[in-house]
């Protein structure tokens, strides 16, 4: 079903120095969202079954949410090359995403705020240490954060997602939290530039009606994330690019058994998101040749050769479970992936 909403907001902030070593940044945002007709809003019982409904005509405004979102940041300058930064922010999200994690399905649905789906609100604090080396050639940082979330959403068990006009009845809400730390080093000058980062994180949810009310991994919980990006300028015309990424596999829910009811096979699942897909990683390489690098030339262009996923890693996109044709009592898993190695050529120009 289609849902319509109008979101508006206003923000103001300020930055000021406190003596010679402190910088204070603060601000506040006022956000408002209105659901707008045409549309039909259903009322549901505790099991997600529709009870009755209200119809709104085209242009009707209903169900307004208003929120204040403060931000606060403090920078402590230890010396000319290092600093400590801390921050707090409240964020309200009026459009939420719910993901069907069963068997690694990539099926995601976006939900605007409505009488049945409240806006997600989060409070986040962060603390980091930042240090520059070699006259700013290298930038390093170590930063940690903690976030608490209210009104996080997820689907019920065995939710019907396709062509379901009562889809909001399949949504449950609860709390969530995440925390982690990121280590980064960046080189900004010289022929070789780029950055490398490692992030360790944890993301959890606790939603009544899901996983027996016990905490479980959020769909985006990926404890380890590594990124390495480099660019080497051989001269004004020729440059090379290198990117390697790695991430822990996405949490998924796999069936561990099945039973038959009225000639229908019903899968039996484990706890929510208790399995993981295979880890994701790939290497990308590129070569760029620039024409007409002279600043006086109005017409400039470049030719780029790139290879996506150089070593042809088959990163899983979807895992489905199927029964053998000759023996339906035997079930096997089948993995689907989108892209293996993918070379490309791009010509760019500007004038």
Model-derived regions, located:
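Short loop/turn motifs that connect adjacent beta-strands in outer-membrane beta-barrel proteins
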Residues: 18-21, 81, 134-138, 191, ...
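Residue-level signature of outer-membrane beta-barrel architecture
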Residues: 12-17, 22, 66, 74-77, ...
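Surface-exposed extracellular loop regions of Gram-negative outer-membrane beta-barrel proteins
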Residues: 34-48, 76, 80-124, 144-168, ...
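Signature of Gram-negative outer-membrane beta-barrel scaffolds
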Residues: 1-83, 94, 105, 210
